[in-house]
Amino acid sequence: MADGNGTQETQDQAPAINAMVQYTKDFSFENPNAPRSLGPQEKAPNIAIQVHVNAQQLAESDFEVNIVLEGSAGEGANTLFKFELDYAGMFRLLNISPNDMHPVVMIECPRLLFPFARQIIADAVRSGGFPPLYIDPIDFAALYRKRLDEVAASAPQLKS
């Protein structure tokens, strides 16, 4: 209800990101060398992590956004563990300009999902017999800019 100063109307026009639901789409954890891999290690394992962000528009203001986290500790025959998590959420975006929609979907939505995906990985690694793996925070804005640069670099250049 408006209070005479247009407060309700202003609130109705404010940009909003609503997480409607979050869910695990796919998850895999492998501990291929257990129980041998669970003993003391001579040196710290090489940990590799890849991050991918995908999005799909479901309706005019609804988007499904996925973070895919793939990682491993160790290499080759000395692999301690591997994981792959596809964690997603459905977001309703309101009052966001068309120019801002893509960055919001690809930066802000994954930023909201990441802490939950990070905890799933940490819990799985701990349940696999290892100390929990807490993935460092991800700069989704930098990841977005990098992806835009890659797309621009692969696009055919027009000669004038």
UniProtKB/Swiss-Prot annotation:
**Main localization (coarse):** cytoplasm
Q: Which InterPro entries match?
A: SecB (IPR003708), SecB-like_sf (IPR035958)
Name the GO cellular-component terms: cytoplasm
Keywords of the record, alphabetical order, are: Chaperone, Cytoplasm, Protein transport, Translocation, Transport
Tell me the domain of life. Bacteria
GO BP terms in the entry:
protein folding; protein tetramerization; protein transport
Nuclease keyword on record: no
Tell me where it resides. Answer: Cytoplasm
Keyword Cytoplasm listed: yes
Tell me how this protein assembles. Answer: Homotetramer, a dimer of dimers. One homotetramer interacts with 1 SecA dimer.
Function, as annotated, reads: One of the proteins required for the normal export of preproteins out of the cell cytoplasm. It is a molecular chaperone that binds to a subset of precursor proteins, maintaining them in a translocation-competent state. It also specifically binds to its receptor SecA.
- Would you identify the family this protein belongs to, as annotated? Belongs to the SecB family.
Q: What is the name of the protein in this document? A: Protein-export protein SecB
